[in-house]
Amino acid sequence: EGGSSGEASGMWFGPRL
């Protein structure tokens, strides 16, 4: 979990790739 909301299920790939 690196971003805030995330794309898939709130994993590492979110707003801040």
From Swiss-Prot:
Entry keyword annotation includes Ribonucleoprotein: no
Compartments reported by the entry: Secreted
Residues annotated with Leucine amide modification: L17
InterPro entries per the UniProt record, alphabetical: Pyrokinin_CS (IPR001484)
Domain of life per record: Eukaryota
Protein name, per record: Pyrokinin-5
Keywords, sorted A to Z: Amidation, Neuropeptide, Secreted
Protein role: Myoactive.
Similarity-based family: Belongs to the pyrokinin family.
Any one GO BP annotation for this protein: neuropeptide signaling pathway
Keyword NAD: no
